[in-house]
Amino acid sequence: MSQIIVINFGSQIAHLINRRIRELGVYSELVMYNISAEKIKKLNPAGIILSGGPTSVYDKNSPQIDKKILKLNIPILGICYGLQLIGKHYGKVLPGKLKEYGKKQISIKKNGILLQNLKEQEQVWMSHGDLVKSLPKDFEILAKTDTCPIAAMENRNKKLYGLQFHPEVIHTPKGMQILKNFVFDICKAKKDWNIGNLPNKLIQEIKDTVGDKAVIMGASGGVDSTVAATLIHKAIGRKLHCVFIDHGMIRKSEAKSVMNRFKKLNFKNLYFVDASKIFLKRLENVSDPEKKRKIIGHTFIEVFEKKEKQLEKKFPNIKFLGQGTIYPDRIESAQPSKQASKIKSHHNVTLPQKMKLKVLEPLKELYKDEVRELGEKLKLPKQIVYRHPFPGPGLAIRILGKVTNERLEILKEADAIFMEELKKADYYDKVWQALAALFPIKTVGVKGDARTYEYIISLRAVTSKDAMTADWSRLPDWLLEKISSRILNEVKGVNRVVYDISQKPPATIEYE
């Protein structure tokens, strides 16, 4: 089977490159920057991609590449930092006068194979500080911008190619075409990878790993945890124990809905824990989003461990902790690389650190759309497979600032109206994720000829393939008007509704 190796130099979106290659039907594997040329040779890839990274190639502790890799006679594409590594090795890289972030127009000087099927002017996404100032010997410039003299370059004889921009993000419209050119026309890779028999493979791996032991798992009801739980359940049956912890920040009627869902899927060992009071008590007067995440994460561990110890007395063979962790969770927690900048903590990634159980993460190498495809193959109901993502900390990170009972009740009602109207209008399945958030400020309004001073609700709906990048959804005006009208009339404490039109990046999908 053909494969492309993506070498990660600490980029938050290195996995996005990996995902894009898989989308092309070619298997790709992500490895760390300190991999040796010998190991690369053994993997025998059709091509190599060098990712971007948050540091300068000249920083003292910046990640470097085994220079022998550049001489393996395997096609290599350097993206951003990856281009600069090639440029540093063969030419000269200088710090840019200004860091360049956002959309830019490139002028293509020579299409070559890498940029074939592109127009003379194309929009791309830049995110860099350094730039290759002088063209390395025997390289050719393929494209430039008004501020970047070498936006793309190649050395066909050495099979080295470089892009200063990011083809993997949606903000580079022809990015997939460029990757396709590299993978199929330069690397000559074969389109021979798909989910295929992955469910059976994962189920067998779980059987082999767990053996005669049992697994305990937090069941949130989301697509990730439900697909992971279903795989584990099919592998070990009644040896799986699922615990649903209500931390008080879940959506309206969520607890009842989740428990009923798992019962319909014939899960036998289900346990409900109402821990809302302890969570809300510990969140009193806490405004910092990272502190909120950590408090929720630590309290979740404490509550979960307490339940696990109770169950362990009855079921002493519980030795594994099942989790629905997927790639984006790990990326945003900067787990794959010491060089990566942390965006925010994910409590399901840090959970095992304080527990003595072995971790079982059947979905850790998959992306959300692949998880959904798995869910379909496992014949899970559509409303589970295409359920919108919901963060572990729940509404606590959709309430900006302090979490109070009043704010929670307001947000639960507003969120319920938003979801209900999206479903009624047949838009729920057309967006990747939709959410309501409460801003911790009040604005002046008028209701019934009286002055009001109440909260703002922000509505957000995005389209995406894998949550690594996202665009705001163009919901129709009439639908937004209806949702806004209902919230303003039915939810006490709100006098203003706004719609968020931010992309990711630079914004994240969630607010905190």
Each language-model region and where it sits:
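Conserved helicase ATPase motor motifs in RecA-like P-loop NTPase domains
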Residues: 76-82
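RNA-binding accessory domains that recognize and position tRNA/RNA substrates
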Residues: 1-50, 54-72, 84, 88-319, ...
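Extended catalytic-interface subdomain
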Residues: 323-324
